[in-house]
Amino acid sequence: MCAALKRCAYRHKGKIMENTNIVTTEQQAPNTISASNAIFNVQALGQLTAFANLMADSQVTVPAHLAGKPADCMAIVMQAMQWGMNPYAVAQKTHLVNGVLGYEAQLVNAVIASSSAIHGRFHYRYGGDWERCTRTQEITRDKNGKNGKYTVTERVRGWTDEDEIGLFVQVGAILRGESEITWGEPLYLSGVVTRNSPLWVSNPKQQIAYLGVKYWARLYCPEVILGVYSPDEVEQR
């Protein structure tokens, strides 16, 4: 084969390889298509459905409220896809409260912190003497179960409502395109009514910081956690 034909064949082969790569990329639609558009893409929807079915078959790596429920797993898959996270990791951070799916505060905090809505990390200002809310105590309670009454030991707070007065956290972050920190309003511990997590007893500063981040995000970047609620918020609804 003459040199000219060889060059022509090489260029033609390069185009075929290039086209093949394009097709391969298009076949990986779920990796590049947005979650909101996935339901309108037949190929992407089929792959997501197959993954949701596989996820629902799991008995160990997904919580009991998702096992055997492909439709619910599909919602988790699409939410994880929107956040760019592992669906199994997201599933482990969910809870069923009053028939509504709730996401753990830790997950919601991570989603907001890793989003493109803010630059860098969140900043926190604590006010008041938080040393007043570091004491805990153990109590025993009688509960009724299927096999009758039984006694449980619980750790509860060792401080009073008066000790919480004046304690607050203020959350702030640098919004995308800005250079200064945008601070939210102070969130007072005495104003937090629903406290489902035991961490409100052992680590109230962390829990109120999580709550402050959610309040800040709902005000300044609501699109990041639209339709996502923590168990504490679900119980209030």
What is each residue range found by the language model?
Residues 13-237:
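Polyanion-binding surfaces on beta-sheet-dominated domains and ring/shell assemblies
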Residues 1-16:
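Short, Lys/Arg-enriched N-terminal segments with co-localized hydrophobic residues
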